[in-house]
Amino acid sequence: MEKYKKSVGNAGEDAAVKYLKRKRYIILDRNFNIHGGEIDIIAKKGDYVVFIEVKTRSSDEYGSGAEAVNHTKQQRIIKAAQVYMLKLGNVSARFDVVVVNGKINGEKFKVEKIDHIENAF
């Protein structure tokens, strides 16, 4: 089950990167990890460095992707972003959530809809 969840999550992140590139975001980093926090995608859009949490769903059985980015998750993302920003200096930051919804088709995840929530928290 864990391998399945990871492959669906990876497919969602790949779809989010393609979506963001079409929207003229410059991808700076992916899967940035520190102890206690991870950021799925770090991108640049205009004057902002954007820290993006991606949630991939094949059903609403466990709630929407946006609902999964609760206060605890937000705090972990913010902590990781603070560490990342140390190497960038004084920049403006924003926190977005990208929700990728789709269906499992055989062994592949087929994207049906992408919702991008800017300034999510």
Annotate each PLM feature.
Residues 87-121:
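Domain-level recognition of nuclease-like catalytic cores that cleave nucleotide substrates
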Residues 20, 41-60, 69, 77:
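Conserved catalytic cores of phosphodiester-cleaving nucleases, focusing on short active-site segments
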Residues 38, 42, 49-53, 94, ...:
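Short hydrophobic-acidic sequence motifs that mark active-site Asp/Glu residues
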Residues 32-34:
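Mixed-charge, glycine-accented linear interaction segment located at domain edges/termini
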